[in-house]
Amino acid sequence: MTDRVTHRVSLDDLNLEKQKFDSKDDIKPWLQDNLQSTKGINVVIERSDTSKIIFKCKNKEKKTKIVESKKTASKTMIRKHTSCPFKIRANYSVRNKVWTLSIVSDEHDHVVDLPRSFVGKNLISNTIPGSSLNVLDSVAPRSNKKGIKPTSEIANTPSVTSYSPSCAVKRNEDVDAPKISSKKARNLTKKPSTQSTRSSSSSDGSSIVSFGSLTSQSSSTSLPENYKGQVPTSMDSMVVEESLTGKSLKPAASHPVKRKNMKANTMKKSKKLKQNPIVVSPIEEDSNLNSFDDANIDLQRQQSLQSPLSHLVQNQDPISLEQNPQLHTVYPQPRHSKQSSSLLKKNQQQDRIPDNMPLQPQENNRTLQNFPLNQFNANEILQNVQQVVRETVKSEILDSPNIDNTYKTDMMDSFVSSVILDYKDYLSSQFLFSLKQNLYDRREATHTNVDLEQNGSNENLFDEQPQHKHNHQHNENQFSYQSQIQNQRQNQNQNQGQNQNQNQSQSQTPGQNSNQNDSQTQIPLQSQTPQDRKSAMQQNWLPGSTPGVGGLIRLSPLLNDNDNNEYAAVAAAAVVGSTPGNPNGNSLENFTHLPGINSSTLNYLMQLPHPSANPNSGGVSSSQPASLMSLQGHQGLLQQQQQQQPMFSMQNSGQQLPPLSSIPKLPSSNNANVNLNSSSTLPLPLNNTGPTLNPSSLLKSTSRNSTNSGNINVNNINNSNNNSNSAFNSVFLNSSITTNPAFIFNSQGNPTNSNQSMVNSIMTTNSNKDGTATSNNNSSGNTSNNLLNDMPNYGPGW
């Protein structure tokens, strides 16, 4: 292994040992400022402790080959970390409580760059002070690629060199010294201190040589083969002429130029070329022209690509527009916001133009706009525009924390509509027609009434600005065709609605027809409101079912909540002739509107029609005057419809109710003791009525007739006897009792009379609620004719 060449830089002029610091943090900034500005050394902290800090040189030559073995079989040593021996130590004095500096080693294994303060100096002093005699030159030969110096170079090369602040150069050994073997060179490198003292004791005349001879020797040795492309050192780039008269030495060549200045020069060339752009085909372009590839040029390319698209958003990037004013003058923008980025890329190929190519005038740039765009370029343009618009909308509107969510939708609607209106002159008629078609389909989905005049006004949505006559006529023809299609759809919907009404009217029973005489006809499907359509769907969800009493759901009456047809059959049976002297006139006090019972078989239990409606009933007529019981309007018509109703309708498995006129009226007398006759018994329940009787139907209540049920009791008018109220009339006419279904089935009477406990409990409770005293609870009527004895026959549904 060969020895490394070391370079020593003197730090005596800085007087580091005399510096004292109170704080630990002040040491590194001070060292970096002084060493970098005067010596060109950049230091970093290698180790740090509470009482010491070790600074080392920040070597730029990391991971480079240093030495290589003579034998090819041995491994090559590669520097992975900084191996420069330069070190400065900072020690903390506990007694004095200050930090002091000490130089551990001022040697380097690499060439130290020229300090910043010496770059601009043009004069080099001729006089060399005595203190700088021990300072060695920094321009030393580097090892070659193999790390072994040739024998011809060893004789003429010093082992340790340095430079002083005054740039005085000194030789350690004589030029005509004999050849030094490699062993002696190794010994000299191991003892740099002895050589430095020897150099200080030598005389001035024998040690100082001319700069010309030094630079001629160092130029052949200081630049090895692997050291290519780097900036030469400060002494190599200077060729100093020494006058024979001993005058001051002046440099004959310019100072060394760093890479940063070289980049600046190349940038100036590229900027000059940008003023006169030339169209170059990508096929004819030379692939070897890569001399102007630079990061700054790439940055300008990106800015030039983004600047034409930045005008889509107002005030988005004013700085980029100001930085590139030439782009707007050289490349005029079209009327649209769509700029081809591929054309801009072709324009940017001017950066790779060779110097020998003649420049063309600026008028040739207009040929770029006449190039036809293929599908790839069009897609690229659309993607660029969409990306800019999406990012802008997302950042300015959607992701803006200052805008509420309620206003974001309005802003998006306004933005899209303004874009369409601004560029509608360049949109195709098919696109506008599709927009209008979608608009009309949307309105038909909401089932709003759309007239032809309104359609005409809506068709002018995009016609606010003048258009070409051809496009306008084409749009009118399409709109007329659209209106014809829409009228045909409306006619079809109306015909379907009429056919549906006819089918429903034919399938209805006479009882159902009576319920729908006063109802309106079915609204056409197109003019229906959402509520009407919802109710129609609820009524017609079963096949063959129609709204009304006949359209009930078979399992439970709870699912039939049609308020329009509620108790229509009850009202039809109750209304009779309007003349006061009609002996057959039926009254409302004989039945009441039970709230919540919708078309159930319990209806006939609570309705008490006149006995004359059924001549075979044999019931006792009531003694109340007919003038207090009659209603006004439509009695004759409803009575005729009532007589046409059949006794039972078995088509729906016992769901329809029997006519109310066939139900016998219970006797009403002044005697509270009720003795039922076999002729006045209620008809037997319908077949298979157990599953249809749901007790939850009694819990449903409506407020339509609840306030009138307790006011139509005529038996309470001008009756001197407090016990004149019939037991059953009180039960079925008093809203406070009938609203509680549990009252009918709870036995609260005398347990000794088990056969009449149900009826007696009802009578007792009713008389107590009305404030009367009824004590006749020991009636000995026919127990087999009790009203509620047949109640268990309705099945387990109760």
Swiss-Prot record:
GO molecular function ontology, one term from the record: DNA-binding transcription factor activity, RNA polymerase II-specific
Annotated Gene Ontology cellular component terms: nucleus
Entries under Pfam families matching the protein: AFT (PF08731)
Region span, Disordered: 142-274, 331-365, 449-545, 642-718, 748-798
Ranges of biased composition (kind: Low complexity): 193-223, 476-517, 657-695, 705-718, 774-789
Annotated compartments: Nucleus
Keywords associated with the record: Cell adhesion, Iron, Nucleus, Transcription, Transcription regulation, Virulence
Annotated knockout phenotype: Leads to hypersensitivity to oxidative stress.
Listed GO biological process terms: cell adhesion; cellular response to iron ion starvation; cellular response to oxidative stress; cellular response to starvation; filamentous growth; filamentous growth of a population of unicellular organisms in response to biotic stimulus; filamentous growth of a population of unicellular organisms in response to starvation; intracellular iron ion homeostasis
InterPro entries: AFT
Leader sequence segment: none
Polar residues: bias regions: 153-165, 449-460, 518-543, 646-656, 748-773
Listed Basic residues bias regions: 256-274
Job description of the protein: Transcription factor involved in iron metabolism, oxidative stress, surface adhesion, hyphal development and virulence. Functions as a negative regulator of MRS4 expression through the CACCC AFT-type sequence in a gene dose-dependent fashion. Acts as a repressor in flocculation, plastic adhesion, and surface hydrophobicity.
Designated name of the protein: Iron-regulated transcriptional activator AFT2
Native source organism of the sequence: Candida albicans (strain SC5314 / ATCC MYA-2876)
Gene this chain is encoded by: AFT2
